[in-house]
């Protein structure tokens, strides 16, 4: 849009990471109409005009686009993905950035739906697509703990507010808490298993592997507290009391402060 002193603005030069995924999750070889053969499975499309058209040939199945891959430019992509496509990207895209983007998009949709439930006075229910994507990410054996910690982090209340045209702080708070509570209850056993499987080394180290495990355990700890399962609460509290590093104790203290305020004083 026009701004004072600059009525006309030329388009930015935007490098746009792009790929197409087959229904099985495999990258499709990309061949432009003017080319004689495919040039790899991913491209950087150079956007230099307000409108641009590229035509790819040889696409035999309906693909799912993977856009702005690897954070190729600091832009917001406005593409109307279906819930099914977002679940697909969160599970099968070989671009880590876009997997996380798909998880955040699904979680925002889920929370915004729960906000509307709250405003209507109806029961707040988790979107089944987000529930499936969350469980798949939580149990993914190939992903690192550090990656899963990022992908499973739920949007902050501020981030939710930014996605809404009209902000209702009470509804946002209720929806975000309800989502954590329900995830903690639905997946308490799986979360507890992931929590136990990601014990860092006995001797504290800031190396990436142990740091990722601590980050994932912090996510699990928060969800276990939110779910309120008695066995999980006891197990989480024991871990907090016996933790050998300050990072986990601080993470636990923050979780208690935010989610179980009546226990904060005792734990601190």
Task: Say what each PLM segment does.
Residues 1-59, 63-66:
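Beta-strand-rich binding/interaction modules
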Residues 8, 46-48, 55-262, 266:
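Long, ordered, helix-rich scaffold segments
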